[in-house]
């Protein structure tokens, strides 16, 4: 392994040194061995990972720090947030030259913990581990999970739970909130150094802050387009949870939709639906506006405005490409928006499972009967006849072989999705000491487009009573 600490040494004013705190009777629950090997960390023993992530004993060369940042939370500005329970242990320099943060969540109190205990619970740690690996397998930019450690440490949320840690990794955990903190705390002179750090280590192909902001806009637009196409709701899109690298960051009360509910809210702390599924594109733009305001004075205002003006076009362009691919369409036609709109209206009014519908839609052929597996999903198949006929006519104009189209659709419409019901089953078993369900679910999610008949029980509709469940922010 090759550990470096560029953030801690080059931006010492943006972090505080912190000693991680040990958990009571920690136990190693999972290692992402494939990813560890990719990062050149496969030489670290299981014992050392347990010591690092559970016993408060960083590996040689690590300099743990908690980063400081601010953020707009549910529309209101919080001037000083920071890593309240996570530590940047160091950065691994992989064989290809890419830097990878080693970021330990649940490591104990930091100067930014405020009234928190600095801990993470097993429930939320499992959810983060599963989600980061699931989104990665779906091709959605995200932080990744390396190590999961459980313990007998009592942690109090709505009820008593047990403490855990997740070692997560990404090229950087820099957020919109990092820029905001220095912009609005009277330390604006430090923003050029942050921009320079980002350009040198993460955007070497770019030359200045204007180009950097344009790229952040582009990446944010594409990320949210991918979320929308995948039916993924983040749940807490505060600016401190927005990555400057365009990654899915900080998994809290997230959720994939089951039945198609456009205004799906997965966070019960969001009664007004500010961060509902269908609001994510607009929230992304609002957050980028706040980032632009923080950069004003350091980046040309006209350049900021020009980049912001491109956001909606970039998001809709990528989203349209993704949805056409999900329907097996390779060409754009003027009627496509109407075709999509009618589909979404039917899905919503009928409460049809979004993921299973798209997966089984791939079985439609140019002629013959409608697939029985598809019809079985529809409460009232007669209501669908008009749309299905339009879709078949559209496929006929496209041409191509049915088998080829099905293979292409299967490669973008997952069979296995991280449904909250499945995650909860894995959590319940893990809290009882059984990691088997977690292991099975993780394995299925890491190959979401493959048939994997041994995991077929994980690809069935969830009970109707569970659909649309909201979750707590507590973790």
Curated annotation (Swiss-Prot):
Keyword hit for Iron-sulfur: no
Disulfide cross-links: none
Keywords: ATP-binding, Magnesium, Manganese, Metal-binding, Nucleotide-binding, Nucleotidyltransferase, Transferase
Binding positions (Mg(2+)): 241, 250
Cofactor(s) listed in the protein's UniProt record: Mg(2+); Mn(2+)
A Pfam family per the record: SelO
EC number: 2.7.7.-, 2.7.7.108
Catalyses which reaction(s): L-seryl-[protein] + ATP = 3-O-(5'-adenylyl)-L-seryl-[protein] + diphosphate; L-threonyl-[protein] + ATP = 3-O-(5'-adenylyl)-L-threonyl-[protein] + diphosphate; L-tyrosyl-[protein] + ATP = O-(5'-adenylyl)-L-tyrosyl-[protein] + diphosphate; L-histidyl-[protein] + UTP = N(tele)-(5'-uridylyl)-L-histidyl-[protein] + diphosphate
GO MF: AMPylase activity; ATP binding; magnesium ion binding
Active-site residue list: 240
Residues the entry annotates as binding ATP: 82, 84-85, 105, 117-118, 168, 175, 250
UniProt xrefs under HAMAP family: YdiU_SelO (MF_00692)
Functional note: Nucleotidyltransferase involved in the post-translational modification of proteins. It can catalyze the addition of adenosine monophosphate (AMP) or uridine monophosphate (UMP) to a protein, resulting in modifications known as AMPylation and UMPylation.
Entry's family note: Belongs to the SELO family.
NCBIfam families the UniProt entry points to: PRK00029.1 (NF000658)
Name this protein carries in UniProt: Protein nucleotidyltransferase YdiU
Gene: ydiU
